[in-house]
Amino acid sequence: MTGEDFPEDLPKEDGCGWIWSMKSEPLIKRRVAGVDDPLFLDSLDIYRTSFPVHEQRRIQDFPLAFQDPGFCYEVFLNGEGRVVAMLVTWRREQFVYLEYFAVDASLRGQGAGQRILEELRDAFPHKVILEIDPPEDGISRRRLGFYQRHGFVPNPQFDYIHPPYTDEGEPFPLLLMTHGDLLDEETYRSFVDFHHRHVVAR
């Protein structure tokens, strides 16, 4: 927590289980209610341009995800009310899975992504699990370094393969990262089972 005051018209608890406050103006976080929410539609440009097609859930499959009580789709608005970042998480007792996290290109390098990640990390210490591309080129290595600077560690001990989001797709390898501690075998198995049963369900 930063100790800053919240505007009177904003709840301190965002419905996803963590308290929200930004250290600088003017980002405002909102939880998206579903695929018919205008904020969802406004976030699709960031979603589509930030992730390769094989890593994207089809738009028609999002309604099923929204039915899960632990699914949180959140967007961040600038002072003009424009969506400039998105964060998609799944909350479970053992872990919080960060599925999608992207910042509009206009804000990259200005610390917005860092602040958003720090708020999530601090709200769920030692529970956040995320995935990155294997660090095989400059971009992926910089992404690895970004998360390492914020307390996340890679888990190369697991040969993690992400299932396809569509019947026509192919599985693809990713590197799991966790906050603070390496994944133990039990948590890893629980995560993989959850991921197959819920995240890529269609």
Question: Where do the language-model regions lie?
Answer:
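Short amphipathic alpha-helix that is part of the acyltransferase structural core
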Residues: 19-61, 173-174, 186-202
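Conserved acetyl-CoA-binding loop-helix of GNAT-fold acetyltransferases
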Residues: 103, 109-122
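A short helix-loop-beta-strand connector motif used in the catalytic cores of GNAT acetyltransferases and
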Residues: 66-75
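Conserved beta-strand in the GNAT
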Residues: 75, 81-90, 95-102
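Conserved active-site alpha-helix within GNAT-family acetyltransferase domains
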Residues: 134-157
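Conserved GNAT acetyl-CoA-binding A-motif
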Residues: 124-138
